[in-house]
Structures are given as structure tokens and as C-alpha cells.
């Protein structure tokens, strides 16, 4: 059993992936070991770093018994974490970091520390959207991206076809704007064939009425899930209204923090598939609690993981630790050098994530330096 942990140092490293994407990592040390955690949070990543610097100043003089004690040690209330994503990301980082450091103290891998049995691999689904963030978002481009993912061995593919919709529009205008998105999904379905499952992420573009119409169109294409037609952190009641009236399971929750948030969504019928993100939900151990709770209440879990290889490894460990977990998300074709920034390199083959020895990896700073990045405090 690991002793109480005291964080003694913190440093950061970021890498530019595309014009729209930067991955940022934090390294926490207790003086004898280090733990690498991804803190990518879009335009709020700078605030996450500031929150972490402030928090570590406190934790350097305070021993923490477990990751569950972090928020209390910092005097942070759950309401703050549920309403401030950058703060939730910082606290999630600290909680994941302490879980990892204590696993190292105990001489066990992270999967075991999370209550699971070590595995060779876990199944993935391909998120093709990260490779389609530029200007070429024609149905043909979606079809080619889906076909490429299927050729790489993925039998589940997710797309986000509605990203050019303004969610503030009227229902009529939302439905008009959704037509091209539905055409994109149809193109993916046609390209990959009936034996590949297709998932759709709506990125909270719709209102209640437009959600129901779009769901009906997508049902005709045989999609596997309907992800966040409405933002669950903003309108869980509206999402529950939709979920109770569509034929496919509703998934979501990627921005939520804490087991209580997800349990409420499941209990009110807003989602059937919980999608915690280890970067935001409270960390790896909290993600396991969220997933096990969902499975026990006739729901399912699929970890949200559209970012870099550091959070991918952590998310794979969580997936491996939860019996009955669904396939894990993997963003395909965003950067050709993605796997090389870890040592050992990330291994994705035949639609599966293959664990490195000990289910752990470090940043390859030689490769990182080739992209003009280095550690900063």
C-alpha cells in the first residue's frame, strides 16, 4: 500500500500537431519517481498550467493520502470543478498523477492499480474527424477517411459531420444546415460497407426538435450511437428528452467532472453510454468509478480520447480495468509522427491499442526537440 504522496516538482512540455492542435503534457515528481499526464485543453491550456503551478505550491508542503484527497487539500469544491473546465483539468491531472506515482511506489502497473487485470491490448474505434479539420470536408473526403481507417483494421469508425453548423440557429435553419452532414455520414457508410460500425458525434449542434429529425435520418443509415446532439453539461433535461425518443443509444459527457455528474445523466436517461475524458473527469481512478457505476446500472462506457498518445495510454489503462468497457477512441491520421513522441513508441495495430511493457511510457525528448519543444517549469 503506497504511503501518502507529496508532489515536489512540476514541469510542462507542448508540441504543435497541426494549425489547430497542440498537445500539452505535465510531469509530476514526488522526488523518487515521475508521472506524465496530458493536460491538453484547447485554448484554456494556459489557464490549466497556471492552476497547476498554484496547486503544486500548496501540495509541496502537504502530503496527500490518495487522489481522492486532492480537491480537499486545495480547498476546491465540486461545484467549482463542474463549472470551470480548466480547473477540472488541473485537478484531474493531479489526481491521475498521484494515482500513477502511488502505483510506482507499490511496484505495480496502472491497470492493476485501477483494479484491473493486465492485458496485451484493448479495442479501439477510429475517430476520423481530427484528420478532417481543414477546409476539405466534402462527403467524398469523409468517405476516403473512413475507407482509410477501415483499411487500417478498424471495424468501428466515428465522424463528426456537423461541425460547420451554428448551434444558435432556429430549428429550421439547423435542419437545413444538417443536410450536408447527413450526406457525409451516408458517404462514410457507403465507403466502409455494412460490416463496419459507424458512430456519429454531433458536438452539441442541435436543439430538441432538430435532434429528433436528424436522429431519424441517421437511423436509416444504421449508425451505432448518437453522441451529444445537445450539450449534457448545459441541458441534461433536453438531452434526456431526445434520448427517450430516438432509436439508437445516446452517448456523451466528455466535458463532465465527477462520478455524480455521470450518474445523474444515466439516472435521468440522458445518456446510455458514458464518455468520461481522463483529462477532465477527475482522472484515471475517477474514470474507472464512473465506468463501473454506469455498467452496474445497465449503461456502458467508452472513454473519450481524441488527444495525444499520453492520454491515449492512460485511457487504455482505464478501458482495460473496467469489465465490459466498449472500444476506446483513437484519433487517426492527425500527425504521421504521433507514435514516435513516446518511448517505447505508441503501437496501434489492427484496430487495437497494444500496451507497452508495464503499461508505461515516457516522452522521447529527441523526437520532441525535432519539433522545437522542450521542458519548461
Task: Mark where each language-model region is.
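Structured beta-strand/loop patches that form or line metal/cofactor-binding pockets in enzymes
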Residues: 2-41, 337-339
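Metal-dependent enolase-superfamily TIM-barrel catalytic cores that perform enediolate-based chemistry
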Residues: 121, 125-239, 245
Amino acid at each position: 500500500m503506497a504511503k501518502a504522496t507529496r508532489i515536489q516538482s512540476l514541469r510542462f512540455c507542448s508540441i504543435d500537431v497541426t494549425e489547430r492542435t497542440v498537445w500539452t503534457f505535465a510531469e509530476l515528481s514526488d522526488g523518487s519517481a515521475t508521472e506524465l499526464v496530458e493536460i491538453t485543453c484547447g485554448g484554456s491550456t494556459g489557464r490549466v498550467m497556471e492552476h497547476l503551478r498554484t496547486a503544486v505550491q500548496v501540495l509541496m508542503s502537504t502530503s496527500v493520502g490518495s487522489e481522492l484527497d486532492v480537491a480537499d487539500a486545495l480547498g476546491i469544491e465540486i461545484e467549482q470543478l463542474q463549472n470551470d473546465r480548466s480547473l477540472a483539468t488541473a485537478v484531474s491531472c493531479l489526481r491521475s498523477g498521484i494515482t500513477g506515482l502511488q502505483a510506482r511506489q507499490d511496484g505495480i502497473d496502472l491497470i492493476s492499480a485501477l483494479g484491473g487485470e493486465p492485458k496485451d491490448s484493448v479495442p479501439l474505434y477510429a475517430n476520423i474527424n481530427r484528420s478532417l479539420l481543414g477546409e476539405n470536408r466534402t462527403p467524398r473526403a469523409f468517405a476516403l477517411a473512413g475507407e482509410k481507417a477501415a483499411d487500417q483494421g478498424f471495424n468501428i469508425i466515428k465522424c463528426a459531420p456537423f461541425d460547420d453548423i451554428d448551434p444558435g440557429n432556429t430549428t429550421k435553419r439547423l435542419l437545413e444546415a444538417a443536410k450536408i452532414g447527413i450526406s457525409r455520414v451516408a458517404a462514410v457508410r457507403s465507403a466502409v460497407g455494412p460490416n463496419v460500425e459507424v458512430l456519429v458525434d454531433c458536438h452539441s449542434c442541435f436543439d430538441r426538435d432538430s435532434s429528433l429529425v436528424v436522429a431519424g435520418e441517421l437511423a436509416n443509415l444504421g449508425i451505432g450511437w448518437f453522441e451529444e446532439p445537445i450539450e449534457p453539461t448545459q441541458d441534461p433535461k433536453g438531452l434526456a428528452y431526445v434520448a427517450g425518443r430516438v432509436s439508437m443509444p445516446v452517448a456523451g459527457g466528455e466535458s463532465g467532472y465527477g462520478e455524480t455528474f455521470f450518474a445523474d445523466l444515466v439516472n435521468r436517461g440522458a445518456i446510455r453510454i458514458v464518455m468520461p475524458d481522463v483529462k477532465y473527469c477527475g482522472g484515471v481512478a475517477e474514470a474507472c468509478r464512473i465506468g463501473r457505476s454506469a455498467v452496474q446500472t445497465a449503461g456502458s462506457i467508452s472513454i473519450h480520447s481524441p488527444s495525444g498518445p499520453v492520454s491515449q495510454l492512460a485511457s487504455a489503462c482505464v478501458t482495460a480495468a473496467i469489465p465490459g468497457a466498449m472500444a476506446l477512441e483513437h484519433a487517426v491520421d492527425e500527425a504521421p509522427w504521433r507514435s514516435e513522441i513516446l518511448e517505447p513508441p505508441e503501437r496501434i495495430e489492427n484496430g487495437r491499442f497494444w500496451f507497452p511493457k508495464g503499461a508505461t511510457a515516457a516522452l522521447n525528448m529527441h523526437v520532441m526537440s525535432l519539433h522545437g519543444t522542450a521542458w519548461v517549469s
